[in-house]
Amino acid sequence: MRSKHLVTLFIITFLSFSTVKVWGKDVFAGFVTKKLKTLLDCNFALYYNFKGNGPDAGSFLDFVDEPEQFYWFVEHFLSVKFRVPKHLKDKNIHNFTPCLNRSWVSEFLKEYEEPFVNPVMKFLDKEQRLFFTYNFGDVEPQGKYTYFPVKEFHKYCILPPLIKTNIKDGESGEFLKYQLNKEEYKVFLSSVGSQMTAIKNLYSTVEDEQRKQLLKVIIENESTNDISVQCPTYNIKLHYTKECANSNNILKCIDEFLRKTCEKKTESKHPSADLCEHLQFLFESLKNPYLDNFKKFMTNSDFTLIKPQSVWNVPIFDIYKPKNYLDSVQNLDTECFKKLNSKNLIFLSFHDDIPNNPYYNVELQEIVKLSTYTYSIFDKLYNFFFVFKKSGAPISPVSVKELSHNITDFSFKEDNSEIQCQNVRKSLDLEVDVETMKGIAAEKLCKIIEKFILTKDDASKPEKSDIHRGFRILCILISTHVEAYNIVRQLLNMESMISLTRYTSLYIHKFFKSVTLLKGNFLYKNNKAIRYSRACSKASLHVPSVLYRRNIYIPETFLSLYLGLSNLVSSNPSSPFFEYAIIEFLVTYYNKGSEKFVLYFISIISVLYINEYYYEQLSCFYPKEFELIKSRMIHPNIVDRILKGIDNLMKSTRYDKMRTMYLDFESSDIFSREKVFTALYNFDSFIKTNEQLKKKNLEEISEIPVQLETSNDGIGYRKQDVLYETDKPQTMDEASYEETVDEDAHHVNEKQHSAHFLDAIAEKDILEEKTKDQDLEIELYKYMGPLKEQSKSTSAASTSDEISGSEGPSTESTSTGNQGEDKTTDNTYKEMEELEEAEGTSNLKKGLEFYKSSLKLDQLDKEKPKKKKSKRKKKRDSSSDRILLEESKTFTSENEL
């Protein structure tokens, strides 16, 4: 019996010890099974022998100090299915058979859901160094370099030049060329006159007869042949991330590297240390003032040497793929990881300063999740569900019992108190048209993206996202602001009715989705900029989902800043259950584990803030307009109660997991009224600048329709909901041409170059011009009044009834009018009827340039038969809440009994 206990104790001790050993120093050792270790060795063997000439020590990748090299190896080797290239199949390099058709990243993520990347880097770096030591012994591994090609100091070659000709050698048949050595180059530099004069001067000093004879042939054929002096390229080699981590500018980084290297040139083993010798030789040959300037450069960090020779383009660097190293034409050095783009030239000069341009800023690799590199859609889906499965049980729906215990006040929210205007800052300008606001909103978001991608502070980046905290909030908040602005101007009859279906958020969505159109706005083709623009594109699509009730086109939701939200969550802001209704709506997306939970959450909170913002601005600074649309907004005090209630619910034990998930991706600033309103005020200030108000032309957007992820989320398209325009959209060439037009001329003709509405339907689906215009005019009657035919009149009247009955709680009719307006309306109908009889051409122009009908929303009530007001209309949206209220009261009374 005692022996059994001893055996048991020994086994437990052994297992505990082995566990500590596995998990103590190396987090991933427990997951890197023998199969994964074998697969990793296969990838290392394939990579180091990729050229087929045996293992190459210059192929070492520095995974820790150069994260970009780590991601390169993951992308091209570890994340793809393992295959042996044709040129290596016949060579006995390694036993690759157990590794075929396997992906290391996919198998690793099945063992570990989503690891922190830094420990993975260190683990793979350790494994690579073991492989390197096994194959190369005591050779010290050096990570690959970033190459910066440079040729000239001013007009002088840094290296001794090469004389090239088109004179053919009689024996070899090749063109004659002459490579100068250092002594010859010194003579060449001391010569006065043209290049041929310098060559002739050089000829008189050369002692080697064979080289002298070659120069003689070149000089004798001067008049009949092409002779040029070309500077060889010197590649400055840097460990880019390591060397430039403390500098915010690429050119200054190279300057600093040269100072450090040239100060200790005698002891430096760096491959670019000999550049100091070449420069010293050149400056001594040229003498003053260059030698003195070089000494100043060595001691003064404000003195610069590396300068851009051309305007830089993107991408700034050329990063090579494995196949590029096999290309005999490119003839790449194995130790070269990436190289400055051939269009981005640099040279050496002591004149002028480094230009202030964001392209010269250091572009360091961001930390990206490993799951980004999963090989196939199947892998991505597997990892998604695997992570979700490990995240815990979903949140169950709230019960009536819980509601009765958690809600202490079952009365409906009411507040008619006046706003304290002394505490409200005037910010809103109602005179700017919606089309202009769209363009300015996109421009402002471009500026925000510039700010985020040019900052080096990664502290604000969440662990589970590569987008700065707060960016999605700003994107959605600005989209909501402009979307609500459109509704307000509609309610005040200040906007063309055609803008009803031109969702501002869809313009922003397509603007940022079409990243090829961002040239000239900010860092074009910059990977970070594209990532941020796509995030904003996706986020902004959720704004109309909240304001206009998902993907269902309901005209009545345009008549309120909160009715779409009420319909979305099936509750009313005045209801005591409204906060729970919002949370329960979000729970459905949280349980799916999707990003939509975060985006819907921000959009809903933004809509609530926007109600408060417009209520305050209109109440304090536009009193007449405020009285017209007071009932279409939520009172700020009610908004504050709702926001506080949502915040408290998110902090509760039941919904705490939702808050944690949100904070993994985004900032808690969404609950700070001060920060939200500061963002709104900043955008309003941006609008008011004269420079921005001139930019009334919206960007030309491609005709690619918006692809929604599901049929229930976002805004869907139906042909009958889209208002077409007569004028065909410009081509991309025309759009780019307009960008070059003089700004004054652009301002004069701004109405002639109004914005193009992004077409939601593909071109192949669009009908002929005549049919299209007639469909448009018929569709407009839904919102503008009856047609000649009785059937159309009935349809329009019913639509008007629906619009007038959708005002929400405590809504009173604001329609006013006189006989003159009725006559105007009748004339409008006649004009529209004449349009139908025209030769298929419509007078509906782009943007706000011209619109025949100026029918006002308050005129819709005049066209419908008068009906008795329903007493139930006031609380129409809260019927479900009433039922729930009765159930909870019943439950409470039963408990009391």
From Swiss-Prot:
Residues 1-24 form the signal peptide. Its main location: host cell. The modification Phosphoserine is found at S804. It comes from the Eukaryota. Component of the RhopH complex. RhopH complex is composed of CLAG3.1/CLAG3.2, RhopH2 and RhopH3 with a 1:1:1 subunit stoichiometry. Interacts with CLAG3.1/CLAG3.2. Interacts with CDPK1; the interaction promotes RhopH3 phosphorylation in merozoites. The gene is RhopH3. Disulfide bonds join C157-C231, C244-C253, C262-C276, C421-C620, C475-C536. Coiled coil: none annotated. Participates in the formation of new permeability pathways in Plasmodium-infected erythrocytes enabling the uptake of nutrients from the blood plasma. Required for maintaining invasion capacity of merozoites. Required for the trophozoite to schizont developmental transition of the intracellular parasite. This is High molecular weight rhoptry protein 3. Residues 820-832, 877-889 have a biased composition (Basic and acidic residues). Residues 788-845, 859-897 are annotated as: Disordered. It comes from Plasmodium falciparum (isolate 3D7). GO terms for biological process: entry into host cell by a symbiont-containing vacuole; symbiont entry into host. Pfam families: RhopH3_C. Residues 792-801 have a biased composition (Polar residues). Residues 802-817 have a biased composition (Low complexity). It is found in: Host cell membrane; Parasitophorous vacuole membrane; Cytoplasm; Cytoplasmic vesicle, Secretory vesicle, Rhoptry. Proteolytically cleaved near C-terminus. InterPro entries: RhopH3_C.
